[in-house]
Amino acid sequence: SGFVKYVYNHFGISIERICRDQAQGGRKISKSELKPGDLVFFDTYDKNGKLNDISHVGIYIGDGKFIHASTDLHNKIAIESLSSSYYSKRYMCARDYISK
C-alpha cells in the first residue's frame, strides 16, 4: 500500500496509505474493466480458504499482470499475473482512481 501511495502521489493523485482504505476510494470496477493504473486488491491471509479482508494491493499494468511490493521478496517490487494460482484465489476487487 505504501508503494501504491508513492506511485500515485508521483503522478499527482492523492490516495490513502492503508490498502483497506484505498479499496474504499475511486470507482469500483469489475475485473473485465481493468486497465493500466487501476488498483487490484487481495486477501493474502489464509483463513481456511475464505476471503475475509483486504490485506494487499497492486497496480494493474495490463495483459493480466500487476506490480506490487512483494512481502515474500522482502518488499521488493515484483510483477505477478492475476491468473497465478496464488493471486487468482485471493483476488477481491478493483478500483479506478484515474478515470473521471
Please annotate each region the language model reported:
Residues 1-36:
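Catalytic cysteine-centered active-site loop
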Residues 51-100:
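Aromatic- and glycine-rich peptidoglycan recognition patches
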